[in-house]
């Protein structure tokens, strides 16, 4: 009897990601599929999107060309402080969007990164769990938007769970970089950014 050998090949991350509905938001090398607003400077370095202020401390936004209403986004972020940045979602304009904030608590009375900001309303929900923020390294963030239900998890902790119907979407996902001399030298690094549509 002839012996048959079977070889099992592990599923690659790219295939597994596609099968579970997750899609990368950038290719790790270029900013293809993104558009810029404002004068901030954006580049891809070592597989991460890096944002810096433009001349004179100018602000700016980097936004996906595609839009979603209901979705989950995962990413990792790291900040060179002092800084004020965030992850836009359901973005239509700077006056019509939600943002998962990435900010220095000393500028906002102890409000921490991972708080939910709504343009026109300030903070809809505040994160005050210091254990959820790694100030000196990478932070894993997960944003879920399903109708009015908005959730933010950071480093394995659920830091925001609320309901708000101000911006139902669809809109872009993006990265915000704040203006101001007080944030001179700021760098926001974002990597491993992917999305799963819930529509």
Show which residues each predicted segment covers.
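N-terminal secretory signal peptides and thylakoid transit peptides that target proteins
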Residues: 1-13
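Carbohydrate-interacting regions of secretory-pathway proteins
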Residues: 18-199
């Amino acid at each position: 009897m002839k012996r048959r050998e079977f070889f099992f090949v592990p599923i690659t991350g790219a295939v597994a990601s596609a099968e579970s509905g997750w899609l990368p938001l950038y290719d790790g090398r270029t900013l293809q599929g993104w558009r810029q607003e404002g004068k901030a400077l954006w580049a891809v370095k070592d597989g991460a999107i890096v944002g810096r202020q433009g001349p004179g401390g100018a602000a700016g936004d980097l936004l996906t060309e595609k839009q979603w209403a209901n979705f989950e986004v995962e990413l990792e972020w790291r900040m060179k402080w002092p800084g004020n940045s965030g992850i836009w979602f359901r973005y239509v304009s700077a006056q019509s969007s939600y943002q998962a904030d990435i900010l220095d608590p000393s500028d906002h009375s102890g409000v921490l990164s991972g708080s939910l900001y709504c343009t026109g309303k300030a903070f809809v929900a505040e994160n005050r769990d210091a254990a959820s923020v790694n100030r000196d390294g990478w932070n894993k963030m997960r944003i879920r938007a399903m109708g009015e239900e908005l959730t933010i998890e950071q480093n394995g902790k659920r830091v925001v769970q609320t309901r708000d119907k101000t911006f139902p979407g669809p809109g872009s996902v993006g990265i915000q970089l704040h203006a101001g001399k007080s944030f001179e030298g700021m760098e926001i690094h974002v990597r491993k950014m992917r999305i799963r549509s819930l529509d």
